Amino acid sequence: MSCPASPSAAVVSAGALCLCVATVLLATGSNPTALSTASTRSPTSLVRGVDRGLMRPTTAAALTTMREVPQMAEGFSGEATSAWAAAGPQWAAPLVAAASSALALWWWAARRSVRRPLAALAELPTAVTHLAPPMAMFTTTAKVIQPKIRGFICTTTHPIGCEKRVQEEIAYARAHPPTSPGPKRVLVIGCSTGYGLSTRITAAFGYQAATLGVFLAGPPTKGRPAAAGWYNTVAFEKAALEAGLYARSLNGDAFDSTTKARTVEAIKRDLGTVDLVVYSIAAPKRTDPATGVLHKACLKPIGATYTNRTVNTDKAEVTDVSIEPASPEEIADTVKVMGGEDWELWIQALSEAGVLAEGAKTVAYSYIGPEMTWPVYWSGTIGEAKKDVEKAAKRITQQYGCPAYPVVAKALVTQASSAIPVVPLYICLLYRVMKEKGTHEGCIEQMVRLLTTKLYPENGAPIVDEAGRVRVDDWEMAEDVQQAVKDLWSQVSTANLKDISDFAGYQTEFLRLFGFGIDGVDYDQPVDVEADLPSAAQQ
């Protein structure tokens, strides 16, 4: 049967069909064989049409059970005369009403089409839609997604781009396998982005470790894309399961005691114990579980106003920035959020639950950087928090018998580093220098080198500096690298920014955080934003 040429014709056709069926029902009464095929017990073409139109886009449970489907067919066969003798008149009235409604709608559309034919046709589906229940076959979450940047935040994410980026890191970890034994059951607190994600990938695909991750990221909602961390975690779990590796992720606030309890239960049930605990949290605020007080971190110097140059990444402009010093309360709050207290609480919870394996290690990520960034970083509020992390490492080692190491990593483009004044300009210059020298590393390169050469080296003992830190910022802090960056710092301006720095590389890396700018992804094609977390079924 050909489709009606227009919405109006469709309405008329439907009304006429309903009217004809009603007439036949009334005429046949107790002889419904006129509606069935005499030589079969199957539904007629009309019923098969209903089956094709309704059963396929919905589940069988939504309409009838599969056991009831044969009964429906029998109801339309010539042998069910007693049922149809009563059903004919009952069906006729609703069908006549439906036919009348359809003809009335056609008449309304025809009148409006005299004045506004295009508008009438556009409004007709809306007028009809509210009369019928919504059908899943007409909904979709596929859309074209392009980056939308506001300051140092990208408000959109691309599911396929995020997945491809995770796959790239997995490929790198597999291509650089360890040469000595390493962790086998790993807990990563903050597993969905940055160093946490790359550490998890290295542990799983380098050491074949079972990994349990804790993260906080919003899933897709009402057709809106999820956070990048959600898509990253989904992609990681899929790849791990395909490789036959245990991978489970808990979505929750790492600062919350309930999340710690859920994690302990998951370890007890699935892993027994863990031999490496990775703490990789960067957050703007934290509620103290003991007091219920909300603390907010800030990025400010201490003691005096700090003025230096930075880059406006939206406009590609080098400008001066002045930052007022933090108050004592702001310093204390920043330490409360970004210091070592929560790391310590995690190890306490794991130790008291008996889920730390003998010889287990724990690491927390930190940064020191060059002196030009110290006023706003190492000597500022965030630096006070990082120094507290080092104090916590000593307490953890002494109190719980679990060796704890602050890991000082390289400056990289992350959502956190993008928010720190001065640092983005430093990174643009640093990338230029290190790429020219062939020593540039991203997150995955850093974490592969951390685990294979620093934390689990061939001699077995972690390699630390005089303060007990594991350093993977050693290539960044090399004297020749820092001197070259200083020379460029004194020259850089808006006019030459793109010539003497790797500003283009900075922008590319920033977009990649959200799944954009990935080779092999067609960003002009619609993509489904829905993505289920494989391990969610276990929770």
Curated annotation (Swiss-Prot):
MF terms in GO: enoyl-[acyl-carrier-protein] reductase (NADH) activity; NAD binding; NADP binding; trans-2-enoyl-CoA reductase (NADH) activity; trans-2-enoyl-CoA reductase (NADPH) activity
EC number(s) reported in the record: 1.3.1.38, 1.3.1.44, 1.3.1.86
Chain sites annotated for binding NAD(+): 190-195, 216-217, 253-254, 281-282, 386, 412-414
Subcellular location: Mitochondrion
Catalytic residues as annotated in Swiss-Prot or TrEMBL: 377 (proton donor)
Chief subcellular location: mitochondrion
Gene3D superfamilies: NAD(P)-binding Rossmann-like Domain (3.40.50.720)
Catalytic reaction equation(s): a 2,3-saturated acyl-CoA + NAD(+) = a (2E)-enoyl-CoA + NADH + H(+); butanoyl-CoA + NAD(+) = (2E)-butenoyl-CoA + NADH + H(+); hexanoyl-CoA + NAD(+) = (2E)-hexenoyl-CoA + NADH + H(+); a (2E)-enoyl-CoA + NADPH + H(+) = a 2,3-saturated acyl-CoA + NADP(+)
GO cellular component: mitochondrion
One Pfam family per UniProt: Eno-Rase_NADH_b
Stored InterPro entries: Eno_Rdtase_FAD-bd_dom (IPR024906), Enoyl-CoA_Rdtase_cat_dom (IPR024910), FabV-like_NADH_b (IPR050048), Trans-2-enoyl-CoA_reductase (IPR010758)
Post-translational modification: The N-terminus is blocked.
Targeting signal (transit peptide) range: 1-68
Consequence of gene loss (knockout): Severe bleaching phenotype concomitant with negligible levels of chlorophylls and glycolipids. The levels of alanine, glycine, tryptophan, and arginine, as well as those for glycerophospholipids were highly impacted in the mutant under anaerobic conditions.
Keywords: Fatty acid biosynthesis, Fatty acid metabolism, Lipid biosynthesis, Lipid metabolism, Mitochondrion, NAD, NADP, Oxidoreductase, Transit peptide
Pathway: Lipid metabolism; fatty acid metabolism
Binding site for substrate: 367
Oligomer status and interactors: Monomer.
Function: Catalyzes reduction of trans-2-enoyl-CoA to acyl-CoA, an important step in the fatty acid biosynthesis pathway, which is performed in mitochondria under anaerobiosis. Preferably catalyzes the reduction of short chain length substrates such as crotonyl-CoA ((2E)-butenoyl-CoA) and (2E)-hexenoyl-CoA. Can use both NADH and NADPH as electron donor, with 2-3-fold higher specific activities for NADH relative to NADPH. Originally thought to contribute to wax ester production under anaerobic conditions.
HAMAP family xrefs: FabV_reductase (MF_01838)
Additional observations: Euglena gracilis exhibits the metabolic behavior of a plant in the light and of an animal in the dark.
Family: Belongs to the TER reductase family.
Name the UniProt record assigns to this protein: Trans-2-enoyl-CoA reductase
Species the sequence originates in: Euglena gracilis
